[in-house]
Amino acid sequence: MTSTVWILISILLATVGAVVGFFVRKSIAEAKINGAANEARRILDGANRDAEALKKEALLEAKDEIHTLRTEAELEIRDRRSELQKQENRLMQKEENLDRKDETLDKREQQLEKKEESLVARQQQIEELESKVGELVQKQQTELERISNLTREQAKAIILGKVESEVSHEIAVMVKESEVRAKEEADKKAKEILSLAMQRCAADHVAETTVSVVNLPNDEMKGRIIGREGRNIRTLETLTGIDLIIDDTPEAVILSGFDPIRRETARIALDKLVQDGRIHPARIEEMVEKSRREVDEYIREVGEQTTFEVGVHGLHPDLIKILGRLKYRTSYGQNVLKHSMEVAYLTGLMAAELGEDEKLARRAGLLHDIGKAIDHEVEGSHVEIGVELATKYKEHPVVINSIASHHGDTEPTSIIAVLVAAADALSAARPGARSETLENYIRRLEKLEEISESYEGVEKSFAIQAGREVRILVKPDTIDDLEAHRLARDIRKRIENELDYPGHIKVTVIRETRAVEYAK
């Protein structure tokens, strides 16, 4: 019973609690709904206020934009009106100018009409005068024909003949004067070019040498060089082809030979043997072979250095080595390599003055004597060998022709070939260039003066300009003007018959008459 009551009470309390909870939750929900509605109304009111503010702001901006556009439009309209006004003013000014020009043209047209009328009148007068002059000329021609018994055609032919003769003579005189002037100018220009080239090219004096000297540390070394029964010296002479001269010269051995390459090989080998101290046939063979290789390498270096100094590039390596061999070749005492470099410089300078290819000219000058490097090993003249080498190594045709023609064996086909021949003559013929040439030079001067002074009436003679000219002073009371010309011809013939000389020699006979009186 008691438990039932408590159960009922519990159920009742639970029911009451549920009802009370329902109403409490309902009141809370209604309160929240009312708060949310109030908040929504507040937010809506704020949004309306913001929208109204934005609307007002947009209206203000629109009004400002409209005001700005209106102001700009007014300014643009004002500018356009101003521009239109200026154009209108310019058009009015042009119209006024055209009106003035129209008036000026009308005035000029009137003036031209007046001048035309005047010209027509003068033309009529001229025609009348020409008619009268024609009649007078016809009358005069008729009268002249009657007086001279010649027709008009005959008189015309006579006059034309005289004019033609006079004109032909004048033309001949002018042509002769032009030829003389051209020759003088050409000679002058050639002398200027040659003198300029020679002044800009410095050359050394040379002397031929056929011996080399090897210094020894002491005279005892001479016996070691000779060896037992002379076997060392015989081996060295056999391998090098050079004669060793061991005499009383203190601490020196002389190497004699005409082949400079062999002589240089022997000198280097002997110098190495002396420094090494071991001198016997096997060691000599080793040193000679080593010296040959050193000389070959040095020859190649000399060839490369020469092409660099002269400014010639692109030569075949074999041709460079052959060029280096020229250092050990001489011609009448003149080193052929130095001579070739000198010719290259001179040819290049003259070619530059004439507007020719300076590099090609230097190349032709450098290679003009290339055949002399091996002319003692190959049959043929150095010109033929040089042409073969240049052709073999595909040198320029101008270079080949320059080699072939520099001694006059063939005709030169280019200006550069002529310049190479001239430079070769300049380098070889100058005093001091070649030892034999120096002796011949002095002998030629003496012979020139001897021939000149052998004639009667010659007072004194002078060989000048390195033997290129001889001036002869004659006695004026013995030799007259005609005799002076004859004397010059006779001396010229004797020089041609008795002397050998390059180029030509100018013979000048000077006859001077002086009248001197003294006032007391």
From Swiss-Prot:
Entry superkingdom: Bacteria
Location of the protein in the cell: Cell membrane
Disordered, as annotated region: 86-111
InterPro entries to which the protein is assigned, alphabetical: HD/PDEase_dom, HD_domain, HDIG_dom, KH_dom, KH_dom_type_1, KH_dom_type_1_sf, Ribonuclease_Y, RNase_Y_N
Any GO BP: mRNA catabolic process
Transmembrane segments: 4-24
GO cellular component: plasma membrane
Domain HD: 336-429
Its EC number(s): 3.1.-.-
Main location: membrane
Pfam families reported in the protein's UniProt record: HD, KH_1, RNase_Y_N
PROSITE patterns: HD, KH_TYPE_1
Any GO MF annotation of the entry: RNA endonuclease activity
Domain called KH: residue spans: 210-273
Membrane topology of this protein: Single-pass membrane protein
Keyword set, alphabetical order: Cell membrane, Endonuclease, Hydrolase, Membrane, Nuclease, RNA-binding, Transmembrane, Transmembrane helix
PANTHER family reported in the protein's UniProt record: RIBONUCLEASE Y
Function as written in the Swiss-Prot or TrEMBL entry: Endoribonuclease that initiates mRNA decay.
The name this protein goes by in its record: Ribonuclease Y
Gene: rny
